[in-house]
């Protein structure tokens, strides 16, 4: 087993939003939410001394042209420290895009599903 080449210093929900404009939209979305799509975007920003902020954004939305839509978004931020010997850009990309994501996914998924449940849309799984 290989040792991790990074350490998560901190992680938190940076932004979270659930919008259902009215009861008609809620009733419509409740029946059509299975058609919604989950988009994932990962960005990173070097801070200092091998410390990087990794933002993982989830957007759960209707791709159809329906007028009755609800939107659900969350940005989960992880602050990581990379080992000093990491110089290769491909290794750094793998850490940010794969390794960090695998590590944070259980918390990220739980927070996002809790938001959906608390917004009136239980029993959704990814």
Residue positions per predicted region:
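N-terminal intrinsically disordered, cationic/polar leader segments
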Residues: 1-126
